[in-house]
Amino acid sequence: MEENVTYKAVCIVEDEEKIRLLADFTREEILRLLSVKPMTETQLSQKLGLTKAAIGYHLHLLAEADMVHIEKVEAEKHGILQKYYSPAAALFIVDPDKIPKDVKTYFTQTQIQFLRGL
């Protein structure tokens, strides 16, 4: 069930729908955690303090947009399959000229927070 997917170092995001997906703190954190190492829904839910259902919802949206993929599947005791997710790229950079007006504030605030941390 493992997918043969090419991993990119950097992905420039220009598609408005993908940009809207990235304008969400939870999805941003999921991608950040997955860029460190592949993780399961359970591991992500424990790290982020969210339910597995919430994580599953966000992973589904990211997978539909080809921003994450299943890197491997492992069977646990009792036959439960654990899917390990990885991002399609180590870093997603949003093209500032393509950001829809309704989410521009989110990215501006995110950039300000990033610069304050430098």
Predicted regions and their residues:
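Residues within the DNA-recognition helix of helix-turn-helix
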Residues: 58
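N-terminal leader segment of winged-helix/HTH proteins
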Residues: 1-21
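Pre-recognition alpha-helix immediately N-terminal to the DNA-recognition helix
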Residues: 28-32
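Conserved segment of winged-helix/HTH DNA-binding domains
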Residues: 14-15, 19, 75-117
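Glycine-centered, phosphate/nucleic-acid-interacting loop/turn motifs that mediate DNA/RNA or nucleotide
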Residues: 66-67
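Key DNA-contact positions within bacterial/archaeal DNA-binding proteins
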Residues: 53
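A short acidic, leucine-rich amphipathic alpha-helix
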Residues: 43-49, 62
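Short capping segments at the starts of secondary-structure elements
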Residues: 25, 36-43
